[in-house]
Amino acid sequence: MTAPATRNDLMIVNMGPQHPSMHGVLRLIVTLDGEDVIDCEPILGYLHRGMEKIAENRTIIQYLPYVTRWDYLATMFTEAITVNAPEQLGNIQVPKRASYIRVIMLELSRIASHLLWLGPFMADIGAQTPFFYIFRERELIYDLFEAATGMRMMHNFFRIGGVAADLPHGWIDKCLDFCDYFLTRVTEYQRLITRNPIFLERVEGVGIIGGEEAINWGLSGPMLRASGIQWDLRKVDHYESYDEFDWGVQWQKEGDSLARYLVRISEMTESVKIIQQALEGITGGPYENLEIRRFDKVWDPEWNDFDYRFISKKPSPTFELSKQELYVRVEAPKGELGIFLIGDKGIFPWRWKIRPPGFINLQILPQLVKRMKLADIMTILGSIDIIMGEVDR
């Protein structure tokens, strides 16, 4: 009897760009030796839309509706970073009420983003039930967004010097009710998932990143904090009104997929704490800076006849960006979202460089999956949390 023939050559497998676990149009060229991953090459660019070049041919106000298409699951953060840049260039003060409203919207958006990470992540490793649970809570957040901004997604709510509109009557009470309800749901998630032996088998010790390694790769957000580095831009940069609230940076030291899950689950609870404090302490006053018209420093009576009335409460659509360089950043759900802006005394930016957290965090994927099993690719990729809209831009 002859022995069965064996093959020693490697197999190359294409995963994506339509694979349901790719979280968008990501393509992985995976080299396999049986079930063992030898190499993995991510192929990007299927969702490239030229967002940086579009920004260089638009005024800031014209460009605002575009930015919600970067990370379309956390649109408040892309809006925040877009208005923060000209606010710093023009030294524009944001009223306290507007700053509190911004914090509330940002943290609600963080919770919604983490929820839509949790559901697909659990589905990737075989747990379908949480995928349906998270839409129950996410729907309530989108109802709050719709009541305040008029849109469930792509809100276009942030403005230079404030926000587009004040909170509607009764919105604060509804948001407080949601916070109380959501805390019970997070407890339910933890009971259902955290100590589940099958879940722990899939994530514990999988995709380990050390603290120094995370820094060297430029990782940020939960990817960095799960490796033992307590770095959160809300604490570091003191932007908006985060210093006025009592909350803590959530972190773990193990650096594996389980640690990244625990960081995000804890961050949702901390976000609720911030929202509750902001809702209870929100002050009266304007929701936008009524002095933004000072962008134009040149006194021109003829220009003033028409346009002073036109921009009495809004920034001019054609204000000039001063000739300087500026880097601004916020702590988005996926990590550090930044913009490098170069003004050239024109109405369009000379350079608008986007620093998306998902693009940077994705670079470590080939190193994490080498010498792992094929099934672990889904676990590791899901724990990174990427959205191809911001990766490809």
UniProtKB/Swiss-Prot annotation:
Stretches of the chain forming a coiled coil according to its record: none
Localization per Swiss-Prot or TrEMBL: Plastid, Chloroplast thylakoid membrane
Catalytic activity: a plastoquinone + NADH + (n+1) H(+)(in) = a plastoquinol + NAD(+) + n H(+)(out); a plastoquinone + NADPH + (n+1) H(+)(in) = a plastoquinol + NADP(+) + n H(+)(out)
Protein's membrane topology: Peripheral membrane protein
Superkingdom classification of source: Eukaryota
Keyword NAD set for record: yes
Pfam families registered for this protein in UniProt: Complex1_49kDa (PF00346)
GO cellular component entries: chloroplast thylakoid membrane
SUPFAM superfamilies per record: HydB/Nqo4-like
GO molecular function ontology, one term from the record: NAD binding
The protein's role, per its UniProt record: NDH shuttles electrons from NAD(P)H:plastoquinone, via FMN and iron-sulfur (Fe-S) centers, to quinones in the photosynthetic chain and possibly in a chloroplast respiratory chain. The immediate electron acceptor for the enzyme in this species is believed to be plastoquinone. Couples the redox reaction to proton translocation, and thus conserves the redox energy in a proton gradient.
Family per similarity comment: Belongs to the complex I 49 kDa subunit family.
Name assigned to this protein: NAD(P)H-quinone oxidoreductase subunit H, chloroplastic
Organism: Daucus carota
